[in-house]
């Protein structure tokens, strides 16, 4: 156990009211209760919705440089208003107070406070709508000192890296720090600190000039955090309590930050030189007299940018995620900030895994279990399920045998890999701002950065990186990840070549069990919440069915998906609606269903052999004569289900099987089946010119018939021009001058899509040629 000096909460609370020297400065608080610098000075009349704050405790002529009305945090399960936060000076409804950064936990009211002080009157505000009420008023001013002794921060250091400034500091020694064995130990220690020292926060100030008590008025508050920010309490996700604790590194492969070190990462809005200071605030009170040299740092030269991930550590397992090595795992942390997060300095971990050996020249045993190095390498974004983490829960390491580099991250928050409202981590309401695709954006931002690392990675790991192929990006996942993967391919079809998802939610509003999970991220279904900058509800925007039907001409990646008809939590009707939308909007897809519940996998396993790329055309197969019938998602009568269950149980008993394992389809249609299960195509011989398109389509040997008919729509065209109304001729033949199977004409529709209806295909290879009509 490390022995650290303590500061006592008794001393902390002791009144030390002193005359303020000219250079003194502090943050005082005005409260409704008996706490704070000026207790019982804040009053709210619920009938008139008027808030009055008695400012007479401030010295005459005080130089006020910050005033913030801190809003109350909402209790768990409290209903969040859907109206925007509305607070304004009495008689001035057009002067609504705006949120004050960095965490949007309060409203900026500097000018109203200055006006009230100049007039010698109380601050009077109308409070129409807030998250959960008002907690206190904070006023930072010169010529003042706090009424109690506050702790001091030391060891402040700053370092800038690629658009982000890392501010580290030594937290005040609060207690003896024990030896931590697990994350549960750290969590218990943090809880004890919060109980002994409630509402302790560390604030980061930034200025263009050195920061002292005399110059603090020129500084801006840019950061605020609680204790123990050196602890990475999200790396292991739901296993955090059982695993040894992980501490952050703020330099590539450096030592972890010592316990008791705080960290805040700031993205400056403008380039230049800056100075920083860190204060300790207790219930909002600050003492800027405490800005000794150890509490300030700078100058540091800053640039504007998103920042770069920091390499935390490297692993070299021989086996991992059902693949054999040698392998390399690189673990990074990126402190996310808007526009990739609703709040600044939000650390999220990322994993990059790759095989280190090149593939053998000849045949070898079980190559599907190996992970190889190829260049340029395909890249797979792997999205974990509920309860998973970047270390697993996404099915497989897909296409590692083809050299695919795995990228995974932790899902924070649980937004099903889509996005969430700007209010997360703040004290905004659903009416303040909108929903952003933060999660999608941050993953693609990490991918963009990863594309550069073959040339820019630290020397110690650069040999493991290889050029990544932006044309061969795919997304894969299971359950929650199986919901996100198709959403990526549907909305980011120009970047995602293909996606594979098991048992996903495709229409969030129609998931029987998980609709509430989405509601925490999007707001109520019937609320007037929209996507940021768009006049559309997030419940529509993140519905794959809505998106496909409202963006018929936009290209999507190949979607490979599966759902269980008896998966009551995810929901079969919404899954079938997705499959129908894929068919009816003519998208490249393979979809299968079964009655294996939440364990229904795609027919494509860990290795997908078709070389799908974003710079190559794709075929959309629909209405294939070999497709099975999924039904209409109409529930079967209960008596019919029970009769079938009893029949299957009796059969199981006769065969010596467990009768409790029988499964019955609760809906109409075939209990198991697929769309496009027996069709494939060759990628190397595609012809795509302004006036001609050719592809070899394969009816696979495992097909249940020697012949089929199918509609074929070329998608993701690279050069073929298909304006509305343009006429085309087509032929279907056996390759290499083989017999003709069909010929005809087709016309581009209103969306610029050309569909060859019910063309015949024979088992094996079939050449389809489309040419502009003369």
Identify the function of each model-found stretch.
Residues 430-465:
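Alpha/beta-hydrolase active-site loop
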Residues 282-378, 741-742, 751:
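A domain-start/cap signature at the N-terminus of enzymes
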Residues 506-618:
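The feature captures the conserved acid-bearing segment of alpha/beta-hydrolase catalytic domains
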Residues 145-196, 285-313:
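Pro/Thr/Ser/Gly-rich low-complexity, intrinsically disordered linker/stalk tracts
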Residues 398, 403-441:
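Cap/lid segment of the alpha/beta-hydrolase catalytic domain
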